[in-house]
């Protein structure tokens, strides 16, 4: 949805046509963080000397975001901005800034709209808290 709006914004805005790539990391088992970030698949684009925007769905402790920032610094990017749809502000344990935050949320497990639990419930078209499994 974000890419669609950026590429086809309302008439008062100029459209942007960013190059998009995806990096996959894993740090959860079920509803609990493992404390370790594992790189599942890396980007294919050459981002050296370029401005990069890292978009995170949710920031819990911030360890994954810290890992990704360090990872992208190795590529010698010109600049790195971070965006997060959801931030569990009370759980963030690392000292880095997130330039753009959609919503601060409580310490609940959230699914839907791309967020999953064990690779399930990702396709729900809205966000939802899970209080019990």
Predicted regions located by residue number:
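PRPP-associated nucleotide enzymes
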Residues: 1-133
């Amino acid at each position: 949805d974000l890419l669609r709006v950026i590429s086809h914004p309302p008439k008062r805005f100029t459209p942007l046509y960013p190059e998009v790539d995806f990096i996959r990391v894993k740090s959860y088992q079920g509803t609990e963080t493992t404390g370790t970030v594992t790189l599942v698949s890396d980007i294919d684009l050459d981002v050296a000397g370029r401005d990069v925007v890292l978009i995170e769905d949710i920031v819990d402790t911030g360890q994954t975001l810290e890992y990704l920032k360090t990872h992208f610094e190795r590529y010698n990017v010109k600049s790195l901005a971070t965006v997060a749809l959801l931030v569990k502000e009370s759980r963030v344990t690392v000292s880095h800034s997130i330039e753009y935050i959609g919503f601060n949320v409580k310490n609940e497990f959230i699914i839907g709209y791309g967020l999953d639990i064990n690779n399930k419930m990702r396709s729900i078209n809205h966000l939802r808290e899970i209080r019990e499994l």
